[in-house]
Structure formats: structure tokens, C-alpha cells
């Protein structure tokens, strides 16, 4: 060996190895799935590169994975004749984890072994899973197209460092040898290894072969026996594929240890010819909100792998969807740039988007419990849909779930169809309120009249909700109405005011004028309202005015926030309003009005510019 050097692992690798060995040991056989899956990916990459450079096959175009073991040496070897790696690639791929957010991901792991196991599996351990059962791993590899003397040797005990060196390797591809730990003899058993390969690799298009040794005429004859079906799962007839095979294929392409929630396998012929296999995961990826999070489908053209993470086939609000598309209409030399401007891509994207929305609608209809799992994991992402995809807005709206005054629970389980089915006779609008929290929404004074009338209100408390409702203007022909904005339909709901009450209100006109004079430009208007039952005052905004929640969103994003001018509404039947109206002393009157306004602002915004002044004012009035 030449050019030998010992290097230290990236700190995150050391941490991941330690956590992984302890968290995944109960499911240790998955190392074989991960290593065979990597070998399959290496074959896919070679096929793709060989489209433009057939010489990379080096006269050996029969791609396969081989598994062998040596009971005496206690080693298990997985080899492929795929694309292989250069020295730099070995250091990059086997010595570091090139994923943004790795550090924060590792910090999120705790003492819950079952949960950590799911997260680590989701992270994609790949090659490192070998250390679950091995106390030393040796890699010999040579990149396709390189000379034999440009082979690379890599070895590590999975602790703090690894050794890398130059070697001569005649055949292209990668060979990984696991030196098994004491007690891992099951992976030296022919039947056990065969059963694992059958379980995890039937769906892989690449032949997976196991070494077969037979004694003939006093000599040991070595042959290779294919274990898996070696037919791409998505090319098979749906009726021939078991649920277990679909689940294992998902784990192979998504590098996820969890079963998917649901899937859809379709072959389309006619104007466009393609096959799609789309999965909805059961758990959100750990880095879903990371700006660099990779998403998209695996793209095949006429069964030839082209690229991972082809995000052009799925809108951003469906970025959680995993799976693949195999198209007959795209060229084999397609690039990401060509995909961006392709009519074929746009048509496929539209068709696949509709397919996913139909899949989710079916899941919601057939299995409400599973759909609730989906909503808890991906609901916030789906809420981006109404703004992004106007063409499918109604279909997306059907999939949304909300908390509401009907259920009296913070769980988001109410669909818009549920709400519409319960609308009161003569009710024309879908009422909702946005707030910082479920508790704030539920206790808002804006709900008082609607509660009294038995009218349901949707309680929205996710940060994205206010933004979403700017785009989601109606459902089933019924407009949405924020109860914190002034609206004629809300005033109509108020009880009919009798003549004596009208006379009493007329008598309050001078009081309203005094309040207007005192507050001046600080409010847009001052008026009496019959929308309140228990609260003395509220602030609301005009229909065309920026809402409180939208102003908060702007502020959180560091943008300049235009001043929100509120309408100050007073309840003429409330004792505090009557007391203020009866106060002749201007200083005391000012204190009462300011207190009522601060209370209304606090209920609306959750904060005050000067909370200490509010407390002093309230204390003074309490003791006066």
C-alpha cells in the first residue's frame, strides 16, 4: 500500500456511530439492507454516467451485488461492480457526514431509545450501519474509468480515526468487509444471510448473489447464486406485489426505518407514458424545515436511473412525498436545467400533484386515525398549498384540519366539510379567528356573540395560518370571515335592539364623542357594539386593514410593520362602560377609557407597549 495516512473522523461521525450502535442494535440486521441499498445506488450511478461514456463499463456491463462470508476469519463481505470511489470521495463519504444541520440533529437526540432509533434511521445511516455488528470495517474500491493502481483502501474500528491508502484493484467497484463482533455469528450462517437478503432486497432491480461453495473432485468450486427477484418493483404488476414488498421498497428509497402511511402505484399510457410509485411517510424528516433539505422523487427514464431528489415533479407544499417516477417521454440525457423548462415535466407535475391529493383524500376518508397522524406530521407544510397552488386550492382545502369551538379541543380534527355541514340556517360565511395560541383564540372576546348564538368558529393558532387565510378566501362557495374584522354579517347576528335600548344608546352619543376626542388619531373609530356579552370593549380592524397576526408575522420576519389602526368598540350594557360614561371628572374619565382600551389591546395582541403603566392605572382605579 502507498500513500497511507491516518485521519480523524469528523466529530459528528464519532457521535453518530456511538448513538447508532446503541440505538439500532435491536434491529441490527438492517446493516445488510443499507449496504446492499448503497451498492444498488452505485450501480444506478454507473449506468447513468455510462450513457455518455460507455467505456466506464470496462467491458463488464453485467452489474450485480455479491455477498460472501468466511467463518474462519469471521468476516462478511458485500461487493459491487458499480461506480466505485476515488480517494477524495472515500474521505468525503466515509470520513464525514456532508449534511447540513447534522450537529443540531444530533443534539436533538435524547434518552428515549425507541425515538432515537426512529430518528437515526430517518437520518440515513447507510455505510455506518456496518459498525452495529462489526468491530472493524475494511473497504477496497476503485472508481470506474480509473487505472487499477488508483484503487483505494479504507479501514476503521469505528472509534476515533480511520486509515486510508492507495492500492491496486483490478476490478471496478467497491468491496466492504465486516470483521464481525463476538456474538454476531448469525451473520455467518448461510440460511440467515439468505433470508435477510430475500426480505430486504427482492424489490431491487440489481441481482444480489450469494457465494456458493461446492466440493467437486476434491476441489472447492465457487459459484454465485442469485437470491432476489432482481426486477424493479415498479415495473411489476400491482397484483403481484405484497404490502410487505411495497413497505420494504419505501425503506430502500427513503432510507427510513418506519413503514409508510400509504402509497400509490400507477402506470399511465396514452399521450404520456410513465409509471409512478408515490409514498406518504409516517414521520416528518428531521430536517424538513432546513433550507437545504433535499426532497423530490427519484427519476428514471425508461428504467434507467437519472437522478435523486428531482424536485421539479412535486410542488413545494408536497415536499414530504417520497417515491419515484419512470418516464418514457424524457430524453436519457435529461438535466435539471432541461427538466425546469420542459412541457413534459410540467404535465407530469400536474398529474402527480393530483395523484397525491387524491391519495390523501382517500386516506382521510378511509382511515381518519392514520390521516390524523399525517396531519400532525405534515399539516403545517400542507398549509402552504393554498398560496402556492391556486388550481388545486379546493382539493387542498378539503384536506385541511382545524381546531374549533365545536370540539372544545386543541386537536386539529375539524375539516371544512365538517364545518359547512354544521352551519346554521341562514349562515352565509365560515367564521374563524387567528391568535398566538389555541388558548388565546378560544378565550377571545370576539367569540362571545357567536358562542351565544351557537355558531361554530375555527380556532387558528399556527404561525402560517394568517398568511394562508389571505389566499384561502372561500370554500364550497362560502366566504371565510375573520371575527376580529368588522363585518356586516357579524352585526346582523347581534340581537335586535328594542326602542328603549336605542334611546339609551342615543344618550351615549356624547360619551362616544368624549372618547373620540380623548383618543384622537390613536384609533380609526369609536363605536358601540352588540357583539359582546361579558367583555366591556374590543378592538377590531376594517376588512382592508392589516390584521394583528399579519403585523406580528411581518415583525418576526424583521420587516417594517405599518401601524395597525383599530376600531375601538364598546359594550353599552357593560357596567364598566356605564361607569366610564357616568364619570364627569376628566382625569378619572381618561383613566377609565385608557384602561378599557388597554384591556382590549391586550386581549387582541397579547402584549402592551407599556404594561407597567397599565398595572398602575388599574391599581389606581381599584382603590379609588
From Swiss-Prot:
SMART domains: HATPase_c. Its main location: cytoplasm. It is found in: Cytoplasm. Pfam families: HATPase_c_3, HSP90. Residues 337-552 are annotated as: B. Keywords: ATP-binding, Chaperone, Cytoplasm, Nucleotide-binding, Stress response. Residues 553-624 are annotated as: C. Residues 1-336 are annotated as: A. GO terms for cellular component: cytoplasm. Belongs to the heat shock protein 90 family. Molecular chaperone. Has ATPase activity. This is Chaperone protein HtpG. It comes from Escherichia coli O139:H28 (strain E24377A / ETEC).
Amino acid at each position: 500500500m502507498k500513500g497511507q495516512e491516518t485521519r480523524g473522523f469528523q466529530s459528528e461521525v464519532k457521535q453518530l456511530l456511538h448513538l447508532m450502535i446503541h440505538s439500532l442494535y435491536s434491529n441490527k440486521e438492517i446493516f445488510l439492507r443499507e449496504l446492499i441499498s448503497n451498492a444498488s445506488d452505485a450501480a444506478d450511478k454507473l449506468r447513468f454516467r455510462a450513457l455518455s461514456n460507455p467505456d466506464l463499463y470496462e467491458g463488464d456491463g453485467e452489474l450485480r451485488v455479491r455477498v460472501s462470508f468466511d467463518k474462519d476469519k469471521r468476516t462478511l463481505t458485500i461487493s459491487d461492480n458499480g461506480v466505485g470511489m476515488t480517494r477524495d470521495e472515500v474521505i468525503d463519504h466515509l470520513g464525514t457526514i456532508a449534511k447540513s444541520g447534522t450537529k443540531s440533529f444530533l443534539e436533538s437526540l435524547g434518552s428515549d431509545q425507541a425515538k432515537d432509533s426512529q430518528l437515526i434511521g430517518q437520518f440515513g445511516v447507510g455505510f455506518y450501519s456496518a459498525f452495529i455488528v462489526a468491530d472493524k470495517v475494511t473497504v477496497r474500491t476503485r472508481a470506474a474509468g480509473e487505472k487499477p493502481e488508483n484503487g483505494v483502501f479504507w479501514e476503521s474500528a469505528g472509534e476515533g480515526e480511520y486509515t486510508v491508502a492507495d492500492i491496486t484493484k483490478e476490478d471496478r467497484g467497491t468491496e466492504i468487509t465486516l470483521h464481525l463482533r463476538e456474538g454476531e455469528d448469525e451473520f455467518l450462517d448461510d440460511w440467515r444471510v439468505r433470508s435477510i437478503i430475500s426480505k430486504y432486497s427482492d424489490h431491487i432491480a440489481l441481482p444480489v448473489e450469494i457465494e456458493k461453495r461446492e466440493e467437486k473432485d476434491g476441489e472447492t468450486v465457487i459459484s454465485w447464486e442469485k437470491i432476489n427477484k432482481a426486477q424493479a418493483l415498479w415495473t411489476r404488476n400491482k397484483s403481484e406485489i405484497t404490502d410487505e414488498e411495497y413497505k420494504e421498497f419505501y425503506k430502500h428509497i427513503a432510507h427510513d426505518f418506519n413503514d409508510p402511511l400509504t402509497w400509490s402505484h400507477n402506470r399511465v399510457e396514452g399521450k404520456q407514458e410513465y409509471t409512478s410509485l408515490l409514498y406518504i411517510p409516517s414521520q416528518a424528516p428531521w430536517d424538513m424545515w432546513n433550507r437545504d433539505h433535499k426532497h423530490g422523487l427519484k427519476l428514471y427514464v425508461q428504467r434507467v436511473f437519472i437522478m435523486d431528489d428531482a424536485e421539479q415533479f412535486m410542488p413545494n407544499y408536497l415536499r414530504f412525498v417520497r417515491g419515484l417516477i419512470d418516464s418514457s417521454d424524457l430524453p436519457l440525457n435529461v438535466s435539471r436545467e432541461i427538466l425546469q423548462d420542459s412541457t413534459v415535466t410540467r404535465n407530469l407535475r400536474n398529474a402527480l400533484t393530483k395523484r397525491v391529493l387524491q391519495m390523501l383524500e382517500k386516506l382521510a376518508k378511509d382511515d381518519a386515525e392514520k390521516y390524523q397522524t399525517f396531519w400532525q406530521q405534515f399539516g403545517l407544510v400542507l398549509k402552504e398549498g393554498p398560496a402556492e397552488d391556486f388550481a388545486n386550492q379546493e382539493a387542498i382545502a378539503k384536506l385541511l384540519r382545524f381546531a374549533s369551538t365545536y370540539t372544545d379541543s386543541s386537536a386539529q380534527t375539524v375539516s371544512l366539510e365538517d364545518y359547512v355541514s354544521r352551519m346554521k340556517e341562514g349562515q352565509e360565511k365560515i367564521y374563524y379567528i387567528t391568535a398566538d395560541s389555541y388558548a388565546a383564540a378560544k378565550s377571545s372576546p370576539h367569540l362571545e356573540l357567536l358562542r351565544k348564538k351557537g355558531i361554530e368558529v375555527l380556532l387558528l393558532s399556527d404561525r402560517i395560518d394568517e398568511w394562508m387565510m389571505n389566499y384561502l378566501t372561500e370554500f364550497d362557495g362560502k366566504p371565510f370571515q375573520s371575527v376580529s374584522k368588522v363585518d356586516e354579517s357579524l352585526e346582523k347576528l347581534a340581537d335586535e335592539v328594542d326602542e328603549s335600548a336605542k334611546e339609551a344608546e342615543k344618550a351615549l352619543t356624547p360619551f362616544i364623542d368624549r372618547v373620540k376626542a380623548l383618543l384622537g388619531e390613536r384609533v380609526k373609530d369609536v363605536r358601540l357594539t352588540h357583539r359582546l356579552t361579558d367583555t366591556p370593549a374590543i378592538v377590531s380592524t376594517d376588512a382592508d386593514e392589516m390584521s394583528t397576526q399579519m403585523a406580528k408575522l411581518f415583525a418576526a420576519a424583521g420587516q417594517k410593520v405599518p401601524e395597525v389602526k383599530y376600531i375601538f368598540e364598546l359594550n353599552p350594557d357593560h357596567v364598566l362602560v356605564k361607569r366610564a360614561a357616568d364619570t364627569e371628572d376628566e382625569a378619572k374619565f381618561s383613566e377609565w377609557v385608557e384602561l378599557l382600551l388597554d384591556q382590549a389591546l391586550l386581549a387582541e395582541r397579547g402584549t402592551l407597549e407599556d404594561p407597567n403603566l397599565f398595572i398602575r392605572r388599574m391599581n389606581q382605579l381599584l382603590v379609588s
